[in-house]
Amino acid sequence: MKRNKIVFIFGPTAVGKSELLLNFPKGVAEIINVDSVQVYKEFDIASCKPSIELRAHVKHHLVDFLEPIEEYNLGIFYKEACEIIENLRVQKKLPVFVGGSAFYFKHLKYGLPSTPPVSSEIRLHINSLFTTRGKNYLLEELKRVDFERYESISKNDIYRIKRSLEVYYQTGIPISQFLKRGQMLANVLAIGLRRPMEEMRSRIISRVKNMIDCGLLEEIKSLLGKGYNETTPAFKGIGYREFLLWKSRPYSMLNDIINLIVKNSFLYVKRQMTFFDKIPNVLWFHPDDDLKDILDLIFV
């Protein structure tokens, strides 16, 4: 197996990524999850988290580690992913990134985007801190969140001090990491999984029915009973947010909610494939027909 190799396995919701991973040899690779809902504790069924069986077969990272009220974004993913890559290389394990978030895959491969625009709320907050607590407080805060940037700029350059904090507060990523962007990952094997759209529609319908059979309704009631609601970041995921409509419209039929989940899932699959098709140098496979070829590529 090539030294320092990194594998990407991506494809739309319900394409069959988990089935592929069950065929991995034990102890050779570890999975880094590339999904924005499976990261949350308690939100299990509609997020289609890797099964206990799969997680026992091959270790997974970035699954089930955030509280539902916490925000998850590119900055958190990128920071965690880079650390995991380094740790796995020390252990001589193969990092395999698996999921459906094309946005995260793109920026992991090609580096972070240029420093983003900052909301007026963040800018006002930083200015308020400067007015009420002074420059030294901002410097101490910068030292805490981005020591590299703190060391590299003049302690009297209030513009850069403020800007550095604005970027961190907006994204969760130190500005020093943005300034290093363009450092593309090398030795990436990108494998895409795809099926005909009618096949995908059938699989989505089966998946949603299985969610209901596995207790999704009970999970939703439990989550709402704990006080989670439309402001909870984890509730933004498909399969969860639709039930908030049911909560506000109790006379809606469960069947209507199920049909809405199927519809939203299929639209999401289309958006995913549009984004994935723009990523260059991807080897595309049907996950059922080409299983041996895929495994040979990954583990040679």
From Swiss-Prot:
Its cofactor is Mg(2+). Disulfide bonds: none annotated. InterPro entries: Dimethylallyltransferase, IPT, P-loop_NTPase. GO terms for biological process: tRNA modification. ATP binds at G11, P12, T13, A14, V15, G16, K17, S18. The keyword Repeat does not apply. Pfam families: IPPT (PF01715). The record marks S101, R123 as: Interaction with substrate tRNA. Keywords: ATP-binding, Magnesium, Nucleotide-binding, Transferase, tRNA processing. Substrate binds at T13, A14, V15, G16, K17, S18. Its EC number is 2.5.1.75. GO terms for molecular function: ATP binding; tRNA dimethylallyltransferase activity. Residues 35-38 are annotated as: Interaction with substrate tRNA. It catalyses: adenosine(37) in tRNA + dimethylallyl diphosphate = N(6)-dimethylallyladenosine(37) in tRNA + diphosphate. Monomer. Belongs to the IPP transferase family. Catalyzes the transfer of a dimethylallyl group onto the adenine at position 37 in tRNAs that read codons beginning with uridine, leading to the formation of N6-(dimethylallyl)adenosine (i(6)A). This is tRNA dimethylallyltransferase. It comes from Borrelia hermsii (strain HS1 / DAH). The lineage of its organism: Bacteria, Pseudomonadati, Spirochaetota, Spirochaetia, Spirochaetales.
